[in-house]
From Swiss-Prot:
The species this protein was found in: Aliivibrio salmonicida (strain LFI1238)
Protein name: Large ribosomal subunit protein bL12
Keyword list, A-Z: Ribonucleoprotein, Ribosomal protein
Gene3D superfamilies: 3.30.1390.10, Single helix bin
GO cellular component, one term: cytosolic large ribosomal subunit
Highest taxon in the source lineage: Bacteria
MF terms in GO: mRNA binding; structural constituent of ribosome
Length: 121
Protein backbone atom coordinates (compact mmCIF):
# COMPACT_ATOMS: atom_id res chain seq x y z
CA UNK A 1 0.00 0.00 0.00
CA UNK A 2 1.38 3.37 -1.02
CA UNK A 3 1.00 6.63 0.89
CA UNK A 4 -0.49 9.48 -1.15
CA UNK A 5 0.74 13.05 -1.19
CA UNK A 6 -2.51 14.11 0.49
CA UNK A 7 -1.86 11.73 3.40
CA UNK A 8 1.68 13.08 3.80
CA UNK A 9 0.41 16.68 3.79
CA UNK A 10 -2.25 15.83 6.37
CA UNK A 11 0.37 14.21 8.62
CA UNK A 12 2.69 17.22 8.34
CA UNK A 13 -0.21 19.60 9.04
CA UNK A 14 -0.86 17.82 12.34
CA UNK A 15 2.79 18.16 13.48
CA UNK A 16 4.12 20.83 15.77
CA UNK A 17 6.68 23.31 14.45
CA UNK A 18 9.49 21.47 16.24
CA UNK A 19 8.43 18.18 14.70
CA UNK A 20 8.41 19.75 11.22
CA UNK A 21 11.90 21.17 11.80
CA UNK A 22 13.14 17.74 12.90
CA UNK A 23 11.49 16.16 9.84
CA UNK A 24 13.19 18.65 7.52
CA UNK A 25 16.56 18.01 9.17
CA UNK A 26 16.09 14.26 8.80
CA UNK A 27 15.14 14.65 5.12
CA UNK A 28 18.17 16.87 4.49
CA UNK A 29 20.43 14.27 6.08
CA UNK A 30 18.85 11.29 4.34
CA UNK A 31 18.74 12.81 0.83
CA UNK A 32 21.84 15.01 1.05
CA UNK A 33 20.03 18.26 0.24
CA UNK A 34 19.40 21.54 2.02
CA UNK A 35 16.04 23.23 2.27
CA UNK A 36 17.61 26.57 3.19
CA UNK A 37 18.66 27.36 -0.39
CA UNK A 38 15.10 27.10 -1.67
CA UNK A 39 13.79 29.32 1.11
CA UNK A 40 16.41 32.02 0.49
CA UNK A 41 15.86 32.01 -3.27
CA UNK A 42 12.08 32.21 -2.96
CA UNK A 43 11.98 34.79 -0.20
CA UNK A 44 14.60 37.16 -1.57
CA UNK A 45 13.54 37.35 -5.21
CA UNK A 46 12.68 41.05 -5.01
CA UNK A 47 15.91 41.86 -3.17
CA UNK A 48 17.95 39.93 -5.73
CA UNK A 49 16.66 42.17 -8.50
CA UNK A 50 17.86 45.25 -6.63
CA UNK A 51 21.23 43.76 -5.68
CA UNK A 52 22.04 42.08 -8.99
CA UNK A 53 25.79 42.01 -9.58
CA UNK A 54 26.00 39.67 -12.55
CA UNK A 55 24.31 40.39 -15.85
CA UNK A 56 23.70 38.56 -19.11
CA UNK A 57 24.15 40.41 -22.41
CA UNK A 58 21.59 39.18 -24.94
CA UNK A 59 21.75 39.98 -28.66
CA UNK A 60 18.06 40.32 -29.56
CA UNK A 61 18.29 41.57 -33.18
CA UNK A 62 21.10 42.23 -35.64
CA UNK A 63 19.70 45.26 -37.44
CA UNK A 64 20.63 46.22 -40.99
CA UNK A 65 24.43 45.96 -40.88
CA UNK A 66 25.14 42.30 -40.18
CA UNK A 67 28.87 42.55 -41.00
CA UNK A 68 29.42 45.32 -38.43
CA UNK A 69 27.53 43.34 -35.80
CA UNK A 70 29.64 40.24 -36.49
CA UNK A 71 32.81 42.32 -36.13
CA UNK A 72 31.53 43.81 -32.87
CA UNK A 73 30.63 40.35 -31.53
CA UNK A 74 34.09 39.04 -32.44
CA UNK A 75 35.74 41.96 -30.67
CA UNK A 76 33.55 41.64 -27.60
CA UNK A 77 33.72 37.88 -27.17
CA UNK A 78 36.99 36.81 -28.77
CA UNK A 79 35.17 34.29 -30.96
CA UNK A 80 36.37 33.32 -34.40
CA UNK A 81 34.58 34.51 -37.53
CA UNK A 82 32.53 31.32 -37.96
CA UNK A 83 31.46 31.22 -34.30
CA UNK A 84 30.59 34.93 -34.23
CA UNK A 85 28.54 34.61 -37.43
CA UNK A 86 26.72 31.60 -35.99
CA UNK A 87 25.95 33.51 -32.83
CA UNK A 88 24.67 36.54 -34.75
CA UNK A 89 22.57 34.34 -37.05
CA UNK A 90 20.96 32.63 -34.04
CA UNK A 91 19.74 35.91 -32.47
CA UNK A 92 18.25 36.22 -29.92
CA UNK A 93 21.28 34.70 -28.24
CA UNK A 94 23.35 35.24 -25.11
CA UNK A 95 26.66 36.93 -25.92
CA UNK A 96 28.12 36.92 -22.44
CA UNK A 97 26.74 35.68 -19.15
CA UNK A 98 27.63 36.58 -15.59
CA UNK A 99 29.47 39.83 -16.34
CA UNK A 100 29.51 42.92 -14.12
CA UNK A 101 27.31 45.91 -14.88
CA UNK A 102 30.09 48.09 -16.34
CA UNK A 103 31.17 45.38 -18.79
CA UNK A 104 27.55 44.65 -19.75
CA UNK A 105 26.86 48.34 -20.43
CA UNK A 106 30.08 48.61 -22.47
CA UNK A 107 29.16 45.59 -24.59
CA UNK A 108 25.67 46.95 -25.12
CA UNK A 109 27.00 50.33 -26.29
CA UNK A 110 29.56 48.69 -28.60
CA UNK A 111 26.98 46.41 -30.21
CA UNK A 112 24.30 49.08 -30.52
CA UNK A 113 26.84 51.30 -32.25
CA UNK A 114 27.25 48.50 -34.81
CA UNK A 115 23.48 48.45 -35.35
CA UNK A 116 22.41 45.55 -33.12
CA UNK A 117 19.64 45.52 -30.56
CA UNK A 118 20.94 44.33 -27.19
CA UNK A 119 19.24 43.56 -23.90
CA UNK A 120 20.83 43.27 -20.47
CA UNK A 121 19.22 40.85 -18.01
Amino acid sequence: MSITNEQILDAVAEMSVMQVVELIEAMEEKFGVTAAAAVVAGGAAAEAAEEQTEFDVILTAIGGNKVSVIKAVRGATGLGLKEAKGLVDSAPAALKEGVDKAEAEGLKAQLEEAGATVEIK
